[in-house]
A protein has these predicted regions:
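Short acidic/polar active-site loop segments enriched in Thr and Asp
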Residues: 13, 59, 120, 181-182, ...
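Hinge/beta->alpha junction and helix N-cap segments in small-molecule ligand-binding domains
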Residues: 67-80, 98-107, 160-170, 186-233, ...
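N-terminal helix-turn-helix DNA-binding module of bacterial transcription factors
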Residues: 1-60, 343-346
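Alpha-helical recognition/docking segments in bacterial nutrient-uptake
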Residues: 60-64, 68-173, 177, 237, ...
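Flexible loop/turn connectors
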Residues: 233-234, 238-346
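Short beta-strand scaffold positions
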Residues: 7, 124, 246-248
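Short acidic capping loops at alpha-helix termini that bridge into adjacent secondary structure
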Residues: 181-182, 213-217, 267-273
Length: 346
């Protein structure tokens, strides 16, 4: 069935049907719902080339990855986000354009995407403090949604984020309630906004209990298994080692676990571990009973939400930038237990 045949069945003009299918704001919701239902009932799929010609849209969304953060591409967290976003694009007949560029060429890439009309919008990843990409995208008029937030940015922008500060505050409070006082923070790179918010939550929880933070127990590195292992081994070798670790990802938490076991210790009995982002499609945190206690948020769902938000901005430009703050659940697993009494295990 083509567009003309669908319009004939509905008793509407092809232009109205096309505008309803493509999210034009001047089409009222009753008509839009009627058109969408008929398209689904008759298994109508719009011709992407025809849509591009009719609307002037590229029917594509961009994701620009600087080489400095190219490890993101093989990170299962990034992969889950892209999978969630991709599901939304596919349902709406949008393509995904993934560009890996040098850091020096990032601004030029955004400007080129805009000037050539290769994409209708972009999702911005790994926001930093006062991220210069946000005012740039506003300046060139390219619709965008930020996965995360950028503290210090004076430019209004659309974003989807997890409440990282509250998640790490709750996790630290849980460990404190178990009697732990030497709690190590294995954080991500702290030029990124999410990592700063996680450290803030950790520090807030310690301050509320009157515990002074120990710089020797706080680290900021890439969230890899190797770095988690290296940090865990170094901290456990201290004269007064931590009795608990709070890791910014399941992957770095796995490295911490390896360091614990190499010393003949048992995770959950001798040393407790809490991780973040355990709800990954291809790296599950156990089955019936979680292996790790975790602050859980679905990165895949965040990808879906960000993509839906961006497509809404593309369909109805000029609206106020929307925001969505997702809360993380605290999932109790086998990796945490009461702080050991007596001398710290070595």
């Amino acid at each position: 069935m083509n567009l003309k045949e669908l319009a004939l069945r509905l008793g509407l003009s092809p232009t109205t049907v096309s505008r309803a299918l493509n999210g034009y704001p001047e089409v009222n919701e009753t008509t839009r719902a009627r058109v969408m239902a008929a398209a689904k009932r008759h298994n109508y799929r719009p011709n992407t080339r025809a849509i591009r010609l009719a609307t002037g849209r590229a029917m594509a969304v961009g994701h620009v990855i600087p080489l400095a953060t190219r490890h993101e591409i093989v990170n299962p967290v990034f992969a889950d986000f892209i999978a969630g976003a991709g599901e939304t694009y596919s349902r709406n007949d949008y393509d995904m354009v993934l560009s890996v560029v040098s850091d020096a060429d990032e601004e030029t890439t955004y400007r080129t995407l805009r000037s050539k009309g290769n994409v209708d919008g972009v999702i911005l990843h790994a926001p930093r403090l006062d991220d210069p990409r946000i005012p740039l995208l506003r300046e060139i008029g390219l619709p965008f949604v930020v996965h995360g937030r950028s503290t210090g940015s004076a430019t209004p922008y659309a974003w989807v984020d997890v409440n990282n500060r509250r998640a790490f505050q709750r996790a630290t409070e849980f460990l404190l309630d178990l009697g732990h006082r030497r709690i190590a923070l294995v954080n991500g790179l702290e030029f990124m906004d999410f990592a700063i918010r996680r450290r803030t939550g950790y520090l807030d929880a310690l301050a509320a209990r009157g515990i002074a933070p120990d710089p020797a127990l706080m680290t900021s590195e890439e969230m890899t298994e190797i770095s988690g292992h290296r940090i865990g081994a170094r901290m456990l070798a201290q004269p007064d080692p931590p009795t608990a670790f709070l890791a910014s990802s399941m992957i770095s938490g796995m490295g911490v676990r390896r360091a614990i076991e190499e010393r003949g210790l048992v995770m959950g009995r001798d040393v407790s571990v809490i991780i973040h982002d355990d709800d990954l499609s291809y790296m599950k945190n156990g089955e019936d009973v979680p292996i790790y206690t975790a602050t859980r948020s679905s990165v895949r769902e965040a990808g879906r939400i960000a993509a839906e938000m961006l497509l809404g901005l593309i369909a109805a430009p000029g609206q106020e930038p929307p925001h969505r703050l997702l809360e993380a659940d605290l999932i109790i697993g086998q990796s945490t237990g009461p702080a050991p009494t007596g001398p710290a295990p070595r």
